[in-house]
Amino acid sequence: MKPSIVTFLMLAAVTAAVSAEDPTMSALKSRVEEIAGQVHGVEDQETTPDLSHCVEPKLCCGSLTTPLDPILDPILLSLGINAAQIVGSVGLLCHPWTEECSSAPQCCTEANLLGGTLALGCSKL
C-alpha cells in the first residue's frame, strides 16, 4: 500500500507539532537563565513552611528571590502572573532535589514553570 499525500501531510503536521517548542516560552526560559545571577537573593526565612502545601518534588533552586524583584517582574507579567499575589519567594533554575544539591530543598507551593526554571511560592526547608 502506497502512502497518500494526505498521510504524508498528516505525518508532517504531527512531527512539526511535537518537535516545535513555543518560541515565547523558550525566550522566557532563556531570560530567567540570564538573570539568575543578577537577582537579589532572599535571606533565610524565619518561618517554617506548611509542608502539606508543598508541591512534589522538593526542588533544588539555583537562587531564591523576592517576587517583586524588578529584574524578574517583566517575566512574571509575560506569564500572566501578578507578583504582588505570590506568597513566598521565587525559585530560579530549579530541578528536583537530590543529595548532590548544594542547597537545602525548597518547598514550592504554587507553581513550577518553564520546565522547572521558575518556581513560585518557595521557601527553604
Swiss-Prot record:
Please verify whether the record's keywords include Lipid metabolism.
no
Q: What would be an example GO MF term here?
A: structural constituent of cell wall
Q: Which GO terms describe its cellular component?
A: extracellular region; fungal-type cell wall
The keyword Iron appears for this protein? no
Any matching Pfam family: Hydrophobin
The alphabetized UniProt keywords are:
Cell wall, Disulfide bond, Secreted, Signal
What the protein does?
Aerial growth, conidiation, and dispersal of filamentous fungi in the environment rely upon a capability of their secreting small amphipathic proteins called hydrophobins (HPBs) with low sequence identity. Class I can self-assemble into an outermost layer of rodlet bundles on aerial cell surfaces, conferring cellular hydrophobicity that supports fungal growth, development and dispersal; whereas Class II form highly ordered films at water-air interfaces through intermolecular interactions but contribute nothing to the rodlet structure.
What is recorded about the protein's domains?
RodG contains a signal peptide and the conserved Cys-pattern. RodG shows a class I hydrophobicity pattern, but an unusually short C5-C6 region for class I or class II hydrophobins and unusually long C3-C4 region for a class II hydrophobin.
Q: What is annotated about its quaternary structure and interactions?
A: Self-assembles to form functional amyloid fibrils called rodlets. Self-assembly into fibrillar rodlets occurs spontaneously at hydrophobic:hydrophilic interfaces and the rodlets further associate laterally to form amphipathic monolayers.
- Name of the protein this chain belongs to: Class III hydrophobin G
Species for this entry? Aspergillus fumigatus (strain ATCC MYA-4609 / CBS 101355 / FGSC A1100 / Af293)
**What taxonomic classification does the UniProt entry list for its organism?**
Eukaryota, Fungi, Dikarya, Ascomycota, Pezizomycotina
